[in-house]
Amino acid sequence: MRNIAVILAGGSGQRLGENIPKQFLKIAGKKVIEHTITVFQNHSLIDEIVVVVHPDYIRDVEDISLRNSFNKLKKILLGGKERYHSSLAAINAYDEEVNLLFHDSVRPLVNERIINDCIRALLTYNAVDVAIPTTDTIIQVDDNNEIVKIPSRILLRNGQTPQAFK
């Protein structure tokens, strides 16, 4: 089965307070999204890359692809208002059965082992999420915003990406 990396780049970066989304800011001479795509471009088990992006930044992604010779980048799709709309656009772009690895464009530090582990886990499971133990204290509140419970950190994880699906 083919392994497709779906780079979710539709965010507007409002929380960052910049004029452009954070995936298009430069770090170490390249845009963050370039670093992220490079990881998947260079991974031997990734067959294809699709980027889901806000319509205003399609040309930017095309330029990035040409400049870096990203030959695995086959599709640039329009992102939706919410993350799930963008994810659905990627799902709908493939009629055949494929493994889809959804990854945030602003997480360029994903490594080969994590990608390998996700793909390998899809041999057993239909859905896989990368998760790390939480170090934060999480609180549960009621309608009055009063603390009603503090769950044990032993049972909690922070979900990360990629999130992979058959």
PLM regions and their residue ranges:
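N-terminal glycine-rich phosphate-binding loop and ensuing alpha1 helix
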Residues: 2-58
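Residue-level signal for inorganic ion chemistry
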Residues: 7, 33, 90, 103-104, ...
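Hydrophobic packing residues within well-ordered alpha-helices of enzyme cores
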Residues: 16, 60-62, 118
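Conserved N-terminal catalytic core of the sugar/cofactor nucleotidyltransferase
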Residues: 34-97
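A general structural signal for well-ordered alpha-helical segments in protein cores
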Residues: 58, 84-87, 102, 115, ...
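Short beta-strand-to-loop acidic/aromatic patch adjacent to the donor-nucleotide binding site
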Residues: 97-107
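Conserved core of the sugar-phosphate nucleotidyltransferase
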Residues: 109-165
